[in-house]
């Protein structure tokens, strides 16, 4: 039973997490908020990373298309501790230009992982 579980986890990682040529995650932007920009002075630094994610799927016989999504990772540095928060939305569109525009809006407005879904719903 344990052996089958390990095989399933390996399959899951290979198929869904992006360890093959059909999946991709690329850093789009990285912003850093320093202590002067933060209202809560207990935090010394916040880093927000915006990723464009894509997955190739078969649309018709012999034809693959890319479906694009977005992932945001927020890292808060509290002294020597680091707190990480992450959220993603898969398969938003097949148009890479739309995803680039969405990522630009997210970066410009410094959207954190918790607000990702709301902002995407508002913009789309």
Give the ranges of each region predicted by the language model.
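A short, exposed loop/beta-hairpin motif centered on an aromatic-Gly-Thr core
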Residues: 83-97
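Gram-positive cell-envelope targeting signals
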Residues: 1-2, 19
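Compositionally biased, intrinsically disordered linkers/stalks adjacent to structured regions
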Residues: 9, 97-124
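Basic helix-extension-helix modules of the SAP/HeH family
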Residues: 52-54, 58-62, 78, 105-106
